[in-house]
């Protein structure tokens, strides 16, 4: 088997995790108590869904996941929620005091005490796997736990499981909406370790997803539940091919191979289509070309940055439902002729496609309509640098005055780490600039094309 272990860190990671596991259970017909009425081969571990669930002798399906937070309230909601019987109590790890939005607390003082327990639980899950493929790590980098403990866990996983892939689903601070004053510090400090210790990181930001909920689903005031259900659709689409058998399956390591041209250039944009409410879906015919066009729309991006400002290096299209390769090829050919979707000149093909015949599921009573086919795109675009430059700018404004720095130093961090992390990000922005400009010497004659 090619198992995958999910690690959910901090409030954001856990709440996204709840949405994901709710959706996985729905897709596989697993009840909230872990039983699976449709599973005839109880205890036989070669079903495709065993990548994400392990089976006990009594036929209970347990997610291969751990949830970690430095304070108990969010995890207590899982312990008392409707899926409380799904998880083994040891998979839910909570501390007593939180990281107080402070990277240094999550990484040095408070996080240090809990990290060995987490790794111990991960080890138990890993020992239960026959061929562990890698880790999915869910966290936000604005807070203290997601950024600090998230970085610490990634660093330790690199030591313990050096060769396994690590995919991060990372919620970045939004341009306008902020939940903490020190978000820029935490983000810069933890991006520093995301750079080194993840193989692919998918950037998400709440503001972009709010806008999608407002615009496409007509939800006036989206809640985190609305956002997380949308995020879970993306993550589900990415992992469909690991959990079901399909026509063109895409493995986690394949994502890496196809999306990451240089090791540092591994921050991805994601988009999903169709995001549509049930009332509208009734009147619209959503064909393969239509949904394919939709995922390239700047307004579909799940992070606030404009792909038209950059160039695509690669993109991965994961279709699910009633889709045949012929339609996909035609849709992709049309996209290639568009002036708005520009690829770097050193990567002429740039498309990796996957198809899975399992139609998308939606949570009953949720906002999304049940549709016949959907597509999720993960793309590597140089415009992602906008996200970093925005955060860097805010970081600089605060750090010039050394504002709030004493809270970090007081928890055992050294001031040098700030400048080191900031320089690393400056280098990253530069890397993106260069990747987008490669082959720029022959661009002088482009004006005559029109």
From Swiss-Prot:
Enzyme Commission identifier(s): 3.6.5.-
GO biological process, alphabetically ordered: microtubule-based process
Post-translational modification: Undergoes a tyrosination/detyrosination cycle, the cyclic removal and re-addition of a C-terminal tyrosine residue by the enzymes tubulin tyrosine carboxypeptidase (TTCP) and tubulin tyrosine ligase (TTL), respectively.
Site (Involved in polymerization): 450
InterPro entries for this protein: Alpha_tubulin, Beta-tubulin_BS, Tub_FtsZ_C, Tubulin, Tubulin/FtsZ-like_C, Tubulin/FtsZ_2-layer-sand-dom, Tubulin/FtsZ_GTPase_sf, Tubulin_C
Highest taxon, organism lineage: Eukaryota
UniProt source species: Eleusine indica (Goosegrass)
Subunit relationships: Dimer of alpha and beta chains. A typical microtubule is a hollow water-filled tube with an outer diameter of 25 nm and an inner diameter of 15 nM. Alpha-beta heterodimers associate head-to-tail to form protofilaments running lengthwise along the microtubule wall with the beta-tubulin subunit facing the microtubule plus end conferring a structural polarity. Microtubules usually have 13 protofilaments but different protofilament numbers can be found in some organisms and specialized cells.
Names of the cofactor(s): Mg(2+)
Compartments in which it is found: Cytoplasm, Cytoskeleton
Gene3D superfamilies, alphabetized: Helix hairpin bin, Tubulin/FtsZ, C-terminal domain, Tubulin/FtsZ, GTPase domain
Top class in the EC scheme: hydrolase
Entries under SMART domains matching the protein: Tubulin, Tubulin_C
Keyword flag Aminoacyl-tRNA synthetase: no
Gene Ontology CC, one term: microtubule
Binding site for GTP: 11, 71, 144-145, 179, 206, 228
Protein name (database record): Tubulin alpha-3 chain
Binding, Mg(2+): 71
SUPFAM superfamilies named in the record: Tubulin C-terminal domain-like, Tubulin nucleotide-binding domain-like
Role of this protein: Tubulin is the major constituent of microtubules, a cylinder consisting of laterally associated linear protofilaments composed of alpha- and beta-tubulin heterodimers. Microtubules grow by the addition of GTP-tubulin dimers to the microtubule end, where a stabilizing cap forms. Below the cap, tubulin dimers are in GDP-bound state, owing to GTPase activity of alpha-tubulin.
Catalytic activity of the protein: GTP + H2O = GDP + phosphate + H(+)
Keywords, comma-separated and alphabetical: Cytoplasm, Cytoskeleton, GTP-binding, Hydrolase, Magnesium, Metal-binding, Microtubule, Nucleotide-binding
């Amino acid at each position: 088997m090619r198992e995958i272990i999910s690690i959910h860190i901090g409030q954001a990671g856990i709440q996204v995790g709840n949405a994901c596991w709710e959706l996985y259970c729905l897709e596989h017909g697993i009840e909230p108590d872990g039983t699976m009425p449709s599973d005839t081969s109880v205890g036989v571990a070669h079903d495709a869904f065993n990548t994400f669930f392990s089976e006990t002798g009594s036929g209970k399906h347990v997610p291969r996941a751990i949830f970690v937070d430095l304070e108990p309230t969010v995890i207590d909601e899982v312990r008392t929620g409707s899926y409380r019987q799904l998880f083994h109590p040891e998979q839910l790890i909570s501390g007593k005091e939180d990281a107080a939005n402070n990277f240094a607390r999550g990484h040095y003082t408070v996080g240090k005490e809990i990290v060995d327990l987490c790794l111990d639980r991960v080890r138990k899950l890993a020992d239960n796997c026959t061929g562990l493929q890698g880790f999915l790590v869910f966290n936000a980098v604005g807070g203290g736990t997601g950024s600090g403990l998230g970085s610490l866990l990634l660093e330790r996983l690199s030591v313990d499981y050096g060769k396994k892939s690590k995919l991060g689903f990372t919620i970045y601070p939004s341009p306008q909406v902020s939940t903490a004053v020190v978000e820029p510090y935490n983000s810069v400090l933890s991006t520093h370790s995301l750079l080194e210790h993840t193989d692919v990181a998918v950037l998400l930001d709440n503001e972009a997803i709010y806008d999608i909920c407002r615009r496409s689903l007509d939800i006036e005031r989206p809640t985190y539940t609305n956002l997380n259900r949308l995020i879970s659709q993306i993550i589900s689409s990415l992992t469909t091919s690991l959990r079901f058998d399909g026509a063109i399956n895409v493995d986690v390591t394949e994502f890496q191979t196809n999306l990451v041209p240089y090791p540092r250039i591994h921050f991805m944009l994601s988009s999903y289509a169709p995001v549509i409410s049930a009332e509208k879906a009734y009147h619209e015919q959503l064909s393969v070309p239509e949904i394919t066009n939709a995922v390239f729309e700047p307004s579909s991006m799940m992070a606030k940055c404009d792909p038209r400002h950059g160039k695509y290096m690669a993109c991965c299209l994961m279709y699910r439902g009633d889709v045949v390769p012929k339609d996909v090829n035609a849709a992709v050919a049309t996209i290639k002729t568009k002036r708005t979707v520009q690829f770097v000149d050193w990567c002429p093909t740039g498309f990796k496609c996957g198809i899975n015949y399992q139609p998308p599921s939606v949570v009953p009573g949720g906002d999304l309509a049940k549709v016949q086919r959907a597509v999720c795109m993960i793309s590597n675009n140089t415009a992602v640098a906008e996200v970093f430059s925005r955060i860097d700018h805010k970081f600089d404004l605060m750090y010039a005055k050394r504002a709030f720095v004493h809270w970090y130093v007081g928890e055992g961090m050294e001031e040098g780490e700030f400048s080191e992390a900031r320089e690393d990000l400056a280098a990253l922005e530069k890397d993106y600039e260069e990747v987008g400009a490669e082959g720029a010497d022959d661009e002088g004659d482009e004006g005559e094309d029109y």
